[in-house]
Amino acid sequence: MTVHFPFDNSYAALPDNFFARVAPTPVAAPRLIKLNRPLAERLGLDPDWLDSPEGAEILAGARLPEGAASIAMAYAGHQFGQFVPQLGDGRAILLGEVIDRDGVRRDIQLKGSGRTPFSRMGDGRAALGPVLREYIVSEAMAALGIPTTRSLAAVLTGERVVRDQIQPGAVLTRVASSHIRVGTFQFFAARGDREAVRALADHVIARHYPEAAQADAPYLALLEGVIARQADLIARWMMIGFIHGVMNTDNCSIAGETIDYGPCAFMDTFDPKTVFSSIDHMGRYAFGNQPPIALWNLTRLAECLVPLLSADEDKGVEIAQTVLGGFAERFNATYLAGLAAKLGLFTTQADDAQLSQDFLAAMAKGRADFTLTFRRLSDAAIDPTELGTVRALFDDPAAFDDWAPRWRQRVTAEPQDGAARQAAMRAVNPAYIPRNHRVEAAIRAAVDKDDFGPFHELLTVLTNPFREQPEFDRYADPPQPHERVLETFCGT
C-alpha cells in the first residue's frame, strides 16, 4: 500500500537556479515519535497510513512519495548583521506542496533529511533535542493563535548525530504557507539577477498576496503586505513574551509566519533586555529589540525590490522609505490594541496606552512573571479590588501598588460585567506557555532516557493554553531558581 500525497508543486516550476534537486538520505531505522493527526487530515493525508512503518519511512526521508518535488531551496541572508551570499537549505528538503482542505497551499518539508548542495560543512542531519523543541513550540504557537509553521511529525532515524554531545538523530516534517524568506530575495539581488527577483516577486504575489496583483503598483503592494504581516506578527510575539533568538533575514518569512525556532524561548520574569540564545552575545535579538530588528530585516527586503518599484533608483528608494515608515504605526496599533485587551479594556480612552506601558514598567521593576501576572489579573477581573494574588508576584510591588487603583478605575468603566470581562481576558492571556524549563525537561527525558512521556504530556497541556486544566496546574508555574534555563542553543 502507498499513501497518496496530493502534490501540486509550484515552486519547483521556477527556474533551476531557485533550488537544487536532491533526494533525502535514507536512514537506518525510522521510528515515529509523534504524528499530528488533525494536521494530517487538514492536509488531505491519511493519518492511519502515516502512522504505519511505511509512513514513518516517508516521514524520515527513507522513501519518496510519488510526485515529490524533492528540492533544497536557495537563499542568502544577513546573520547577526553580516551578509552571507549563499546559505540555502543545508539540512532540509521540500517534498512538495499540497492544497489543504481550506484551499490554502502548504509546503511539506523534511528537516534533518541529509546533505544538500547547500550543506557546506554540515552533516545535513538534525538532533532529537532541536526537533522536539520545534515541534513543541510551533504547535504551542499555533494553539496561541500566532502565525507559525506547523509540525506534522517527528521521527527518530535510528542513527546518532554529533553536536556538543552525541544525540539520537531525528527528522521533523514541517508544514508552512511557504519557506520563502527575505533571504530568498537577497540571494538573487546580491547577484544582480533582476529577472529572478521579478519572477520570485510574481510567485509570491500569486501565492501569498493575490490582492497585490490588482493594485496599480503590484510590487509596492507586495512590500506593503509583507510589512503589515511582519508588524502584526512581531506585535503578537511581544504580547506573549516570545523571544525568537535568531532573527536573521533568512529566518524572516515572506508569508508572515514564525519560522526556524532554533534557540527560541519564552520570557519568565519580565525584562525587555532578556536574551536566551547562546550565540546572541551582544543581545541583538533581545526581547525588546525584536520590533526594530524586524524593520531592519524588512529594509533589506525593500532594497531587493527597489528596481521593481521604479526604473529610477532614487525614486524607488524614496518609495521604499515611505512604505517602511508605516511599519511603526502598524506595529503600535496591533500591539497597543493587544495590550489593552490583555488588561480587559475593550473600549478606547486616551490614556490606555500609558496605562499599558506603566503596567509593563511595574512588572519590570518588580521582576514579575510575564505570563502569570496577566493571567492572575484576568482571574481578578470579576472583582478588581481583589488583587492580592497579582501583587504577590512582584518582588517589589511599589510600582504595582501605584498602578492598581488606576486600572481598577479604568476597568470598571467598561460596559461588561465581571464574568464577561474575565472570560474576555482569559481568552487572550494564556495559562500555559512552553515554559523553558518544561521544554528542557521533556527534551532531556527523551534524549537521555528514551522517555517521551513528558513530551506528549506537555503537548497535551499546550494544545489548550487558555483553558484551566487543574490536573496540570504545575505547568502554569514559573521555574524554581534551580529550574531556570539561562541559555538556549540553536542545535545546528
UniProtKB/Swiss-Prot annotation:
ATP binds at G88, G90, R91, K111, D123, G124, R174, R181, D260. It comes from Rhodopseudomonas palustris (strain BisB5). It holds the Pfam family SelO. This is Protein nucleotidyltransferase YdiU. HAMAP family: YdiU_SelO (MF_00692). It comes from the Bacteria. It catalyses: L-seryl-[protein] + ATP = 3-O-(5'-adenylyl)-L-seryl-[protein] + diphosphate; L-threonyl-[protein] + ATP = 3-O-(5'-adenylyl)-L-threonyl-[protein] + diphosphate; L-tyrosyl-[protein] + ATP = O-(5'-adenylyl)-L-tyrosyl-[protein] + diphosphate; L-histidyl-[protein] + UTP = N(tele)-(5'-uridylyl)-L-histidyl-[protein] + diphosphate. Belongs to the SELO family. The gene is ydiU. GO terms for molecular function: AMPylase activity; ATP binding; magnesium ion binding. Nucleotidyltransferase involved in the post-translational modification of proteins. It can catalyze the addition of adenosine monophosphate (AMP) or uridine monophosphate (UMP) to a protein, resulting in modifications known as AMPylation and UMPylation.
